[in-house]
Amino acid sequence: MIGIIGAMEEEVTILKRKLNDMNEINIAHVKFYVGKLNHKEVVLTQSGIGKVNASISTTLLIEKFNPEVVINTGSAGALDQTLSIGDILVSNHVLYHDANATAFGYEYGQIPQMPKTYTTDPTLLKKTMHVLEQQQLNGKVGMIVSGDSFIGSSEQRQKIKQQFPEAMAVEMEATAIAQTCYQFKVPFIVTRAVSDLANGKADISFEEFLDKAALSSSETVSLLVESL
């Protein structure tokens, strides 16, 4: 079983339409769609936006369906200036940009008693990049950071880049999903597509290009599932 998580309806609709023999299960106001994608058994869920929603949905997914791997799909705001709308992002590790327990000796972005970063499963990363290369898609590997704020101003963007110069993108769920997978010892990967440039026009760009980003990310996930 392969678990797939997207936060918003737009981020899961394309994959949902591709499911064969689909069965819908509702648990604690979270919808799970069980079926086959490219002849592989999958469970797809729309987690809702933000870290708590993402963690709840991931916990339910793992406890109820026991997936072998978890894939997080969706959109993200670009922090790397070389990225363009629709580009594919693949995590090598993820962390929180809004966690601060430095007063107790932890690094910025680190939750107390937890790792600073959560590392993508190397086998999943290798397979994802192989899929992108085969399809000649523009994919980039790097750090993705998460927090409970939509980054819609240049000031917010700059603050994150000051703390995490290597961060290539920002969104609101991936690290919570990764932390949950870490605690349950389930391999994970994050593959998202750029919907906005995390600047003063991010809100307009996000609304305009969300569907494009969702399509790019969904196609990547579909191809990855086929390769697993």
Curated annotation (Swiss-Prot):
Keyword Hydrolase: yes
GO biological process, one term: L-methionine salvage from methylthioadenosine
Pfam families in the cross-refs: PNP_UDP_1 (PF01048)
Signal peptide: none
Reaction(s) catalysed (UniProt annotation): S-adenosyl-L-homocysteine + H2O = S-(5-deoxy-D-ribos-5-yl)-L-homocysteine + adenine; S-methyl-5'-thioadenosine + H2O = 5-(methylsulfanyl)-D-ribose + adenine; 5'-deoxyadenosine + H2O = 5-deoxy-D-ribose + adenine
Active site residues according to the UniProt entry: E11 (proton acceptor), D196 (proton donor)
Single GO cellular component term: cytosol
Pathway: Amino-acid biosynthesis; L-methionine biosynthesis via salvage pathway; S-methyl-5-thio-alpha-D-ribose 1-phosphate from S-methyl-5'-thioadenosine (hydrolase route): step 1/2
Alphabetical list of NCBIfam families matching this protein: MTA_SAH-Nsdase (TIGR01704), PRK05584.1 (NF004079)
Name recorded for this polypeptide: 5'-methylthioadenosine/S-adenosylhomocysteine nucleosidase
Species for this entry: Staphylococcus epidermidis (strain ATCC 35984 / DSM 28319 / BCRC 17069 / CCUG 31568 / BM 3577 / RP62A)
